Regions:
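Short, intrinsically disordered N-terminal pre-domain segments
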Residues: 1-11
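Ser/Thr/Pro/Gly-rich low-complexity disordered regions
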Residues: 11-108
Length: 108
């Protein structure tokens, strides 16, 4: 909002009130053999209004195409790799991305 007179103009920016922020990070659980299913928690997020969550699984810091659910089934291509899930919390005020713990290496 800008206000002023002939000599001065004052400008303020609205604060990004209510944007999500992480209180505790997400955690992956499961066993590390091909065919097993890993599951991630959302972690704990403070957000008002409430946040919605999305997921992106990664192997060795590289995105796994199509792996965007809160569960992931390990495949042969994961052998030897470290698996992480990035959980995004989004609301009308903003978004935060938080990486989970890494699990690995994946075995056959």
């Amino acid at each position: 909002m800008g206000i002023g007179n002939a000599n001065y103009v004052y400008w303020t920016e609205a604060a990004n009130v209510g944007a999500p922020f992480t209180l505790t990070p997400p955690v992956i659980s499961g066993t590390l053999s091909v065919g097993d299913v890993l599951t991630t928690t959302n972690g704990t997020v403070s957000a008002a209004p409430a946040a919605t969550f999305s997921y992106q699984w990664m192997k060795d810091a590289t995105v796994i195409a199509g792996a965007t659910a809160n569960t992931y089934t390990l495949v042969t291509g994961n052998i030897g790799g470290m698996i992480t899930c990035v959980v995004s919390a989004t609301n009308t005020a903003g978004r935060i991305n938080t990486a989970s713990n890494s699990l690995g290496p994946v075995i056959a």
